[in-house]
């Protein structure tokens, strides 16, 4: 074997090592930015339609302004057409949520935009269109590589309740429910709250409104939503599990 062959083999080995380290680093980063759920509470036994009917009743009594800001639900046929158009299959519980109400109307009224404090219920077609447009803009090779490492895990996420700055409540059709396919994120401190089912998420919201953890502030015009974080935190522990130690 001559000198140049040895150099070529050395370069090839170096490339393989660098690529392997790159894949390892990407996997490690993804597990950090998108962890598997810790042990979660049991799935709520109540059927989703009953949970949503109860939530509707609670909103009518405790937060009528929030209920007034929601759009009418979609038919099963409407949802099927959108699934076909955007080539996605929604989980059954998510379909049920959009048959209940198709998100919140866009409004300058604070409560009119928000379904829960600081989070808007995104209409289905808007959510699917935003997901379809994601990543279609021009980007350099370096920008695309950085995205794959730091945010590529979001490719399969769909935002149900959005805070408008890339955090909120999501579902991931590519994850199993036992892995935490429904979850809340707060990127600033890498907090996740995982739910074993969308039923747990909606039941938790119903309880937050029922017990005053979510409420409409008395007095301000336009009305604003408020959150009792201590009370809400205890409620969420009944329905989901955080990746952060308490």
Question: Language-model segments: which ranges?
Answer:
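N-terminal type II signal-anchor transmembrane helix
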Residues: 11-29
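Intrinsically disordered, low-complexity regulatory segments enriched in Ser/Thr/Pro
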Residues: 178-186
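Compact, glycine/acidic-enriched structural inserts
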Residues: 191-212
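Low-complexity, Gly/Ser/Thr/Pro-rich intrinsically disordered linker/tail segments
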Residues: 223-246
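Short, surface-exposed beta-strand/loop micro-motifs that present aromatic residues
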Residues: 167-174
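A surface-exposed partner-binding patch
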Residues: 28-165, 216, 239-246
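N-terminal Sec-pathway targeting helices
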Residues: 1-15
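Mixed-charge (acidic/basic) macromolecular-recognition segments
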Residues: 210, 217-223, 233
């Amino acid at each position: 074997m001559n000198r140049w062959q040895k150099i070529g083999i050395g370069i090839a080995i170096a490339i393989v090592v660098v690529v392997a380290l790159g894949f390892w680093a990407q996997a490690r980063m993804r597990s950090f930015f998108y962890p598997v759920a810790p042990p979660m509470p049991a799935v709520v036994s109540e059927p989703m339609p009953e949970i949503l009917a109860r939530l509707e009743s609670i909103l009518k009594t405790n937060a009528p302004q929030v209920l007034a800001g929601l759009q009418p639900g979609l038919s099963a046929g409407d949802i099927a057409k959108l699934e076909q158009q955007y080539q996605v299959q929604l989980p059954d519980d998510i379909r049920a949520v959009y048959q209940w109400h198709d998100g919140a109307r866009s409004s300058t009224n604070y409560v009119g935009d928000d379904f829960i404090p600081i989070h808007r219920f995104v209409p289905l077609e808007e959510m699917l269109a935003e997901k379809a447009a994601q990543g279609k803009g021009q980007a350099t090779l370096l920008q695309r590589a950085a995205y794959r490492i730091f945010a590529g895990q979001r490719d399969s996420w769909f935002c149900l309740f959005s805070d408008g700055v890339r955090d909120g409540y999501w579902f991931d059709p590519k994850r199993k429910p036992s892995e935490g396919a429904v979850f809340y994120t707060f990127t600033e401190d890498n907090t996740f709250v995982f739910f074993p089912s969308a039923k747990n998420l909606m039941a938790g919201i119903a309880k937050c409104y029922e017990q005053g953890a979510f409420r409409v502030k008395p007095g301000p015009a336009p009305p604003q939503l408020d959150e009792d974080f201590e009370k809400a935190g205890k409620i969420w522990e009944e329905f989901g599990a955080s990746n952060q130690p308490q």
